[in-house]
Amino acid sequence: MKILRFDHMHVKPENYDAFVGNLQKLIGHDVLMNMPMPEYGLQVAYEPFPVGLEAFKPVAESNDSYTFRNATTEKGIFSIAFKVENLAEATAEMEAKGWKKLEEYPNGPIQEALFDTKKDFGFYMELIEYPFDTLAEMFALAAQASQAGQAPQC
């Protein structure tokens, strides 16, 4: 498995709205993304700079992702995501090392998988693969396409 770099972390804050407001005050602008993600039963805020930070709040009891995240009562850092060269190979290696895959998130060009590494590392580990240098680059391309009235070519 080739880990390319630290990509982002997921945080389950005590108070989602206060966390997002304080983060925006800290960085001096609105977070890049703050929106419901009904397919995962979550409200999600994402900011790629200076370090990728994704906060989430479980909001709908309609799926396994909600159930899993809501059952985790601990607040704070939930998982750390590492960008990998090949998610399929990395997943096979993680499972061979005994870390169970908990979820997969296929989202267009972004492919993610979450593993149960909490006992060994103190947090869950997510591996992510995408064809851009950074997620910020992908969001910028999507924004340009949206402004031009086109579908994003991610």
Task: Report residues per predicted region.
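Surface-exposed interaction/gating patches
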Residues: 1-21, 25-26, 30
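Vicinal oxygen chelate
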Residues: 1-2, 5-14, 44-50, 66-89, 91-154
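A cross-kingdom feature marking solvent-exposed beta-strand/loop segments within repeated
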Residues: 7, 26, 31-39, 60-78, ...
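Conserved short beta-strand elements that form part of the metal-binding/catalytic scaffold
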Residues: 30-69, 111-135
